[in-house]
């Protein structure tokens, strides 16, 4: 039987050679038939300590490695890029300042 594989996001990397991966799945409510997000956290073995919080990783079922660890990181699918987010936030701040400046000029001109 093949081993189960899942894709999730690293939510904690504070332990040595272990990461906590949150896996999100959609289930249908039994009565209302609406699809709901369900999240479960798995402890996964990270041999090289290369995963960081925010990384999207693929984990695979393995033999029990500790009391709670039964998964291992197979590969990092996408790295988390905080620099890109900071640049986007700075651009948004600049645009807001420009808009606020234009609004102040319009109000100042109307009062005179």
From Swiss-Prot:
Source organism superkingdom: Bacteria
Any one of the GO BP annotations: translation
Matches recorded under InterPro entries: NA-bd_OB-fold (IPR012340), Ribosomal_uS17 (IPR000266), Ribosomal_uS17_bact/chlr (IPR019984), Ribosomal_uS17_CS (IPR019979)
Pfam families registered for this protein in UniProt: Ribosomal_S17
Swiss-Prot/TrEMBL keywords: Ribonucleoprotein, Ribosomal protein, RNA-binding, rRNA-binding
A GO term, aspect molecular function: structural constituent of ribosome
GO cellular component, one term: cytosolic small ribosomal subunit
Entries under PROSITE patterns matching the protein: RIBOSOMAL_S17 (PS00056)
UniProt-listed CDD domains: Ribosomal_uS17
Family note: Belongs to the universal ribosomal protein uS17 family.
Function field: One of the primary rRNA binding proteins, it binds specifically to the 5'-end of 16S ribosomal RNA.
Quaternary structure, from the entry: Part of the 30S ribosomal subunit.
Protein name: Small ribosomal subunit protein uS17
Organism whose genome encodes this protein: Thermotoga neapolitana (strain ATCC 49049 / DSM 4359 / NBRC 107923 / NS-E)
Annotated gene: rpsQ
